[in-house]
Curated annotation (Swiss-Prot):
Organism domain of life: Bacteria
InterPro entries tied to this protein: PyrdxlP-dep_Trfase (IPR015424), PyrdxlP-dep_Trfase_major (IPR015421), PyrdxlP-dep_Trfase_small (IPR015422), Ser_HO-MeTrfase (IPR001085), Ser_HO-MeTrfase-like (IPR049943), Ser_HO-MeTrfase_PLP_BS (IPR019798), SHMT-like_dom (IPR039429)
Source species: Prochlorococcus marinus (strain NATL2A)
Pfam families from the UniProt entry: SHMT
Protein name: Serine hydroxymethyltransferase
Amino acid sequence: MKCDPSIAKLINNELSRQETHLELIASENFASKAVMEAQGSVLTNKYAEGLPNKRYYGGCEYVDGVEQLAIDRAKNLFGANWANVQPHSGAQANFAVFLSLLKPGDTIMGMDLSHGGHLTHGSPVNVSGKWFKTCHYEVDKKTEMLDMDAIRKKAIENQPKLIICGFSAYPRKIDFKAFRSIADEVNAYLLADIAHIAGLVASGLHPSPIPYCDVVTTTTHKTLRGPRGGLILSKDKEIGKKLDKAVFPGTQGGPLEHVIAAKAVAFKEASAPEFKIYSQKVISNAKVLSNQLQKRGISIVSKGTDNHIVLLDLRSIGMTGKVADQLVSDIKITANKNTVPFDPESPFVTSGLRLGSAALTTRGFNEQAFGDVGNVIADRLLNPNDEDIKEKSINKVSELCNKFPLYSENI
């Protein structure tokens, strides 16, 4: 990028950071070169308001083909009857659902943010918590898992118009069939936000919400390993028509066809047999990481994981998430502080550290390597003031990064 050396330098610095750090943020992954090539294509030049073959601009014959291919691949990948690939993000996808199915003042019920939910599921700082009445369900205090009987009771008490089942920090499987039963009992719509587990659902390694939910939203990165973006799915074409209008002109203008092309590439990659093998490794690697940390005396929320998320409860070692986040950052491990169920600390401090296995699995990290990662993290957290251990940890991180390079060729 000779025309802008300042930006070129920052991009190269970011590439170097990704190559030399262990990426354990659960919401991040590494897109393939093919996905990035599509996103960096000339499709970025084309405005295409509307849907394929129903545009407000001329010259859309080729972007129509791109978007229709993305739609068809998404439907086939998830077994849906309808799909909209235009949402710019998962939050935009959720907002489109709210606009199409709800009126301001209606009640929505989602998982409490501090228990693993998401901002867009009714948090008071988000538009979902400002435009709608909200109520939230929590995990059981003893098991730290969803208690469907308690959720049913909460739904009956509050009579929500929409129930959301989904999370940003819940490491266990979701019983979509049980949620459907509750939604039917209170005559509510059911929305599944599978942003974190979409790749596992696509691989058949997590139960699919499509047969049970009125609408399904997701991001296209995370475990799906595509570009940053959103996606809406449904088994109901009539609801789909409402959702199309809610996306455009309801909440967005022109779609990002270069990103949609990258989504199409990612959907094709996710339909390959190799992707299921990858997803199996994502889960097995997360289990190894969880088990290793527990062996070292660090508590894990719900005592394990069924997906890519490993949530550390640092109260077990007398540490806050804020401190732990900085400690692992100092040895080139990227994670994020996170609330845990019934957390006494503020969201700016927290008692937890959230880890995810998807990105390092993309790099080729195997179970042995994830065991090593668990030991490096434990060494650092259990010996925060030991400079010798800190130095050894940095060296081990460097060794692992060299053993499992991010990209095998220049990008």
